[in-house]
């Protein structure tokens, strides 16, 4: 979606987008391709796209807080978050609503000022509580 195409959005959605201060993202299937890769030794791999990293960098440059909520726990996610300067991270959150409440509180904003991007059933309760979701 280009910036010029934002003109075609309904005014209430544009208003909610203008109020976003916190962008929260699921990891598997949103920042990765959703696959789980295991080496013979048991090491787990995840494939992150550099374009998503660039988007997170730009969101932070624009003044948005960015955070991650994921149902799995992985050193790889910790490393990627550190590389991107993302400090608002909750891993192992099978119930993501408490994680949402914690991160919103830490960011000093409200759920109405939060956008969330998810891709699975576990994300639906969070998506129902934030100002903007996809």
Regions found by a protein language model. Give the residues of each.
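Non-catalytic pre-domain segments flanking phosphatase-related domains
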Residues: 1-25
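Asp-based phosphoryl-transfer active-site loop
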Residues: 17-35, 127
């Amino acid at each position: 979606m280009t910036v010029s195409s934002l003109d075609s959005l309904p005014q209430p959605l544009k208003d909610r987008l203008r109020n976003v201060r916190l962008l929260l993202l699921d990891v598997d299937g949103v920042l990765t391709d959703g696959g789980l890769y295991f080496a013979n030794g048991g090491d787990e791999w995840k494939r992150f796209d550099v374009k998503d990293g660039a988007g997170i960098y730009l969101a932070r440059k624009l003044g948005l807080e960015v955070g991650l909520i994921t149902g799995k726990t992985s050193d790889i996610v910790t490393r990627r978050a550190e590389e991107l300067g993302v400090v608002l991270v909750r891993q192992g959150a099978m119930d993501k609503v408490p994680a949402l409440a914690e991160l919103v509180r830490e960011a000093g904003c409200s759920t109405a000022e939060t956008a969330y991007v998810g891709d699975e059933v576990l994300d639906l309760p969070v998506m129902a509580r934030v100002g903007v979701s996809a």
